[in-house]
Every structure is written in structure tokens, then in C-alpha cells.
Amino acid sequence: MKLLPKILAHSIDHNQHIEESRQLLSYALIHPATSLEDRSALAMWLNHLEDRTSTSFGSQNRGRSDSVDYGQTHYYHQRQNSEDKLNGWQNSRDSGICISASNWQDKSLGCENGHVPLYSSSSVPATINTIGTSTSTILSGQAHHSPLKRSVSLTPPMNVPNQPLGHGWMSHEDLRARGPQCLPSDHAPLSPQSSVASSGSGGSEHLEDQTTARNTFQEEGSGMKDVPAWLKSLRLHKYAALFSQMTYEEMMALTECQLEAQNVTKGARHKIVISIQKLKERQNLLKSLERDIIEGGSLRIPLQELHQMILTPIKAYSSPSTTPEVRRREPLLMESPSPDCKDSAATVTSATASASAGASGGLQPPQLSSCDGELAVAPLPEGDLPGQFTRVMGKVCTQLLVSRPDEENISSYLQLLDKCLVHEAFTETQKKRLLSWKQQVQKLFRSFPRKTLLDISGYRQQRNRGFGQSNSLPTASSVGSGMGRRNPRQYQIASRNVPSARLGLLGTSGFVSSNQRHTAANPTIMKQGRQNLWFANPGGSNSVPSRTHSSVQKTRSLPVHTSPQNMLMFQQPEFQLPVTEPDINNRLESLCLSMTEHALGDGVDRTSTI
């Protein structure tokens, strides 16, 4: 460390090995064995303008005239910065640096003795850092230390396009040839994080490129808005930045070779290509769903497929052979407005009641109704995914209007309509048609009695739980505890929980004893339903079952003491399993009323066995 200052002083005084001395000094600054004091002393050779008149510079045999000249130059440089408010980048560089260069060339220690790169690199960082941070104040002597210390860990041979005259690493002929234009005009301004011998400008340019880059996810009508969610569902969302630079057509034409060129891993490449192939097959899938719906199949699977498809990227269809004006008129020509659909809504709704009453599951293929009659006139062109989607939605609407009401399907269809109405791929005509279908289905949904919907939900609960369980019937505690008050409403509410479509006759052990358990009637013994209903004898005799029955399935005969009058009462033909839904509801209410009357009658004449 004692030898290094002598070498540097000799190199500067004799203008020899300037570049090698600079590299040696930079290596010494970044060497881990260099102490903090040594680093501070070595840094003065490169950067401290204020300390030029100090003892360290005096020991290097520097002339006092250079210090005076530097002081005047530095003052002029600061004055120019303060007057211009640092708004003129070129002016601040020319006024501060080039004048100092011309003054230095006039002195005995001119540009040839190596002082230009040494001195200029000390004054410019303050100016550049001031511009980068958009401040109009001149940094003090202490403020000049921060860029110097940041530059300690950087390697010297790097090209520094952002460092004015600190490209003192350039040849002196280049400096003289540039004259008043000491810096090339294409240099980018330094960012606040940049420093001497830094390549930070590359990072800032990269950020600027990213901000100005195209992002198709945010473009209207690009069809790419749903790509991030689609990639996330495939667990490939880390490649979203790659897709954001593509158009819809480029994405659909992606190949494994193109993805490999973008450094996409093999597994992800394969998954992306397969997923794009599925996107290409969506129109054929919609045609297949349309055929299934027309043939009267279940709507649940098509609705699930449509829900998954609406989340994938879909672009509005535009015919390549037509002008934009014709494209706007084409939907109006192909799809006429649907006043017939609205006018015939009442007809379809009225036909729905009779159709629902006669339909029990398997449906005949429906005639083309007002919902999809217009859409089936002409085949849709290849690639018209929104049009094909709208056609399938019309088929689903027709099936919902003429088939047995299903709350889940209707709710799922309405949710799907809401997604379509806000999707950018559908035309205004298609959205008007979808809105018309939504109004029809909502009207049909509101026309159903709530009791029917409760029965349907009860039927689903019973189907999910299975048979032979006691969850769907009133428990002994709920019914037996209410018997003391003789509240008829309790029996009516309890009876409504019984599923209507799989109605078995009620086991009434709850009306007889609070210890006895209830189970639903098994379909295998529904023919013996008359044996599953036990009532207290209205005639007044104390007819109690001879033993406690834990399960209805174990009971294949009536209790011993059941009277013949009870048997005759349940042998009426009206108590057979009804066929239609309204009859089920009416007869279920009649059964509940009959049960309530018997229970209240036993309580009045005090002959009840409960």
C-alpha cells in the first residue's frame, strides 16, 4: 500500500501506463485485504475534487495553479447547474465538463498528462446523480462520497456509457476529437442507483422496454383477457409474461419448437400444446353437446362443460373475407331479432306446465321452439365459437322450458348467462338473445310454487342419504314433545320434509312412543306401505304395538293389536302412489291433515294410547 501511491504519482506525472494504473487502483479498491483507511486514501485519487488541494495531493507534486483553476471550473460548473435547474442535460454537460477540459489543456499539466480522466471523473458523478434524482441543489463534498463507495465493488474494465469523461478510460485522441461534444448524444441518463463503472443503465433500459412492451391481456377485443386465469387453472401461470406478448392467433398456432426456443421446460411445453389443441376442438365439442341436448339427454353434463368453456380464452368472431362494415351487419342478417321469442314466451310457459306434468324423466326430442329456431337456419362458419356457444345455450333454454323443472340446472344456466352477458366475445345481437332467454327462464323459475322447490330439495337430500335412514322423517323427540300441546302445525311442517317423489307411507311409531325410531320406507316394500303406518285406534281401545320396532325393514306385518278399521281406512285406492307432481302434493297434504285430525281426536276424547 505504500508503494501504490508512488506508482500512481509516477504514472500521472510522466503520462505513462495510465490505463494500467487505473486498473491497478480499481483492483486495490475491491481487494478484500484493503482496509477502510487505505480505501479512503486510494479513492481520493479518483474522485475527491475538494481534496485536490489537501496534503495528499500536495505530496504528489501537484501545482497550486491547477487547484485554483479547478476551483474556478468547479464553481462555474455548480453555477451552471443552479441556474439551469438541471433541466438541460446537454448544456450542463457541455458547460461543466468541456470548459474544464479546455482550461486544463491550456495548463502545463494539460490533457496529455492524464489529469482529464482523473479530474473529470470526480466532478461528473455529482451532476449525474443530481440529475438522476431530480434535485436542483448542488451536492456538498460529503455527498460525493456515496457514489464512490458504491463503485468500489465494481470491476474497472466495464464500458461506462453513462459516465461523462469518466470514459476517461477512452483514449485522449477520442477526447480531443469530440471537442465541445464530450459525450455521445445517445447516452441514456443515469438512474439514481447507477455509479462509477456500473452497468446499471442496462437495467434501466430493460425496465423501460418492459413498460413500453405490448401487453395483449389489456387490449380490448384481443381475446387474451382470460389467458392468465386459464394458465393458472393449468398451473402454468409463470409463463403469463410469455403469452402477454402474443396475439390470440399466435397463441393458437404455438408449437413445441417455438416454446423450446423461449426456454419453456419440456413438461410445460407438452402441457401447453395439449391445452391449445383442446381449445381448437371447442367448436366440435359444442356441436356434440348440441346433439346430446336435442336427443333429450341430461342437462347437467352439458352445463358443466359450458361453465368450463366460458373460462377459456374466446375471441370475437370476424369473417376474414368481409369488411368491418359488413361484419357489423352480418349478425343482424344471420340472427334476426327475437320478438317472436318474447311473444311466444307465454305459449311456451303454458306448454311447460302440461309438459312438466306429463314428463317424468325421459323426454321426447323437443320441437324447435322460439329460443333456438332462428339459430338453426344456417350452419355456423368454422371458428365462430361465440355463435356456436349461443346456439347451444338456446338448446338448453328450450329443454329447461319443456322439461321437468330442476332447480340446480336452472340456477346453473342463469349463472352461465350472466357470464356470457359480460363477455367481450359475444356480439350485441347475441347478448340480446341471451338476455331474452334469461328473462324467460327467470319467469319460469318464479312461476314454480316454493313448495314444489322444497319437495325437490327434499327429494335430493333423501337420494343423497340413501334409504333406510331416519333423517327425512320426524323424530320421536320432535313429534312426541309436541304431542303434549297438540299443535297441528308441527305435523304439517314435519310432513313437508318427506320427499314427494319417493313417498313411502309414514311409520308412526313416533306417535305411539317416544322410544321408538323411524326410518324411511324401502322401495322394495313400498307395495306393503299400508303395513308401515301405525295409528292409535280412534275407536278408543288401547291398541299399543306389542313390541318396539327398531327398523321398518324388519317389520313385514302390522302390529298384533291394530284394528281392522285402520286397515280398511288405508285400503282406499286414492292412497296408491300418484303419478304426477301436483297430485303428490295434494295427497301429501291430505295425509298430513288426516294424521292431525286423528291425533287431535284422540286427545279430545282422552282415549289416546300415547
UniProtKB/Swiss-Prot annotation:
SUPFAM superfamilies: SAM/Pointed domain. InterPro entries: PHAT_dom_sf (IPR037093), SAM (IPR001660), SAM/pointed_sf (IPR013761), SMAUG/VTS1_RNA-bind (IPR050897), Smaug_SAM (IPR037634). GO terms for cellular component: dendrite; glutamatergic synapse; P-body; postsynaptic density; synapse. Gene3D superfamilies: Smaug, PHAT domain, Transcription Factor, Ets-1. Keywords: Cell projection, Cytoplasm, Methylation, Phosphoprotein, Repressor, Synapse, Synaptosome, Translation regulation. GO terms for biological process: nuclear-transcribed mRNA poly(A) tail shortening; positive regulation of translation; regulation of postsynapse assembly. Residues 177-222, 318-366, 464-487 are annotated as: Disordered. The modification Phosphothreonine is found at residue 323. Expressed in brain (at protein level). CDD domains: SAM_Smaug. SMART domains: SAM. The keyword Phosphoprotein applies. The keyword S-adenosyl-L-methionine does not apply. The modification Phosphoserine is found at residues 67, 319, 472. It is found in: Cytoplasm; Cell projection, Dendrite; Synapse, Synaptosome. Its main location: cytoplasm. GO terms for molecular function: mRNA binding; translation repressor activity. Residues 344-358 have a biased composition (Low complexity). Residues 467-480 have a biased composition (Polar residues). Residues 222-295 form the SAM domain. The modification Omega-N-methylarginine is found at residue 465. PANTHER family: PROTEIN SMAUG HOMOLOG 1 (PTHR12515:SF8), STERILE ALPHA MOTIF DOMAIN CONTAINING PROTEIN 4-RELATED (PTHR12515). Acts as a translational repressor of SRE-containing messengers. Belongs to the SMAUG family. This is Protein Smaug homolog 1. The gene is Samd4a.
